[in-house]
């Protein structure tokens, strides 16, 4: 528990949007920012459990900060942070796809959105226990390496067919346009 408390304290000492807002609130109210942060986390957790807009809140938590961090990573000269956030987005996308197909089943689970939010926070957690990193290297990467050649072949075939269809439609549209112009004369 001390490790979690120390990480929490270190987070509150960093300079970012959340800690600046907490600092401003602390200055106005006189309440220590540790208590303000704990209260905000508690309210968010309760809202995820019982609130009306839990799906929206969960989606915002899973998207807003990672999108911001991804933009910062793109703008930084380091490649390592790019890899961290690309890994998160791969896991996020696969999770969203799985969630789409299992939505009817998942809607029966109480507190689903609290669990989903906890999972997404686990996936974006900094450090060696980053959930997206673990899922990618233990599950996604081995499956990808095993099947990527077959998938590449299928995608190449489909894109070739799509280009053929698009070329045919463009040719047909040109003929129709010429016919319409000739009829209009």
Swiss-Prot record:
Membrane spanning residue stretches: 43-63, 89-109
Keyword Endoplasmic reticulum included in the entry's annotation: yes
Topology versus the membrane: Multi-pass membrane protein
Record's keyword terms, sorted: Cytoplasmic vesicle, Endoplasmic reticulum, Membrane, Transmembrane, Transmembrane helix
Expressing tissues: Expressed in the retina (at protein level).
InterPro entries (alphabetical): TB2_DP1_HVA22
A Pfam family per the record: TB2_DP1_HVA22
Cellular-component GO terms for this entry: clathrin-coated vesicle membrane; endoplasmic reticulum; endoplasmic reticulum membrane; photoreceptor inner segment
Record's function text: Required for correct function and survival of retinal photoreceptors. Required for retinal development. In rod photoreceptors, facilitates stability and/or trafficking of guanylate cyclases and is required to maintain endoplasmic reticulum and mitochondrial homeostasis. May play a role in clathrin-coated intracellular vesicle trafficking of proteins from the endoplasmic reticulum to the retinal rod plasma membrane.
Subunit relationships: Interacts with STX3. Interacts with clathrin.
Protein name: Receptor expression-enhancing protein 6
Upper classification of the organism: Eukaryota, Metazoa, Chordata, Craniata, Vertebrata
